[in-house]
Amino acid sequence: SDDLSFKFKNFSQNGKDLSFQGDASVIETGVLQLNKVGNNLPDETGGIARYIAPIHIWNCNTGEVASFITSFSFFMETSANPKAATDGLTFFLAPPDSPLRRAGGYFGLFEDTKDNDSSYQTVAVEFDTIGSPVNFDDPGFPHIGIDVNRVKSINAERWNKRYGLNNVANVEIIYEASSKTLTASLTYPSDQTSISVTSIVDLKEILPEWVSVGFSGGTYIGRQATHEVLNWYFTSNLINTNS
């Protein structure tokens, strides 16, 4: 079988296991910061961090698709009005050579389009802190959504977002290949509040055989927030029936 597992209890500034695009970096505290904030930045900023090794997500010879589990903790900080702070973060699967695309509410994964574009070959779970119905065809509230080749989610659940280091969120995302079910759950351990979203997603129809996995985040001028990942665990299992 084609298995891959890795675990970051925290992140290292001189680690060699992540690659970065845009504003993503590991900061001194051992936290993966997905975007910068500050005065001398463009209107939309964002970044991507991905695991350096590609993941074999399906096998074109056998048709087998991998199941995977990933879990991570994140928090967000803002000096803006928290209600208006933008834009959120994602966990994604995409081609290993995919570029950093439009930042801000497109999370570096998509361009300025509402159309489903299969050339993106991207599946993401978004933690959208604003939910703009005008720009993104979104529900008009913060939400956790599952995105397939576009920034508009195919399914979304309302999310009462929280800011500050005392509001760490724990996330678990599970893909069950046999049922093609992708489920994302977020829990605030401080009070055990939990929400989850699930969709049927056929990874073989959407993704290339080999993908990269990682995080992206974005924000917008005047309503800036940072999106910071504290730890990350990932494991995938692709059964090779003909081996």
From Swiss-Prot:
SUPFAM superfamilies in the record: Concanavalin A-like lectins/glucanases
Keyword flag Manganese: yes
Keyword Calcium: yes
Pfam families: Lectin_legB (PF00139)
GO molecular function: carbohydrate binding; metal ion binding
Entry keywords, A to Z: Calcium, Glycoprotein, Lectin, Manganese, Metal-binding
Glycosylation positions in this chain: 10, 116
Stated family: Belongs to the leguminous lectin family.
Functional summary from the UniProt entry: L-fucose specific lectin.
Protein name (database record): Anti-H(O) lectin 1
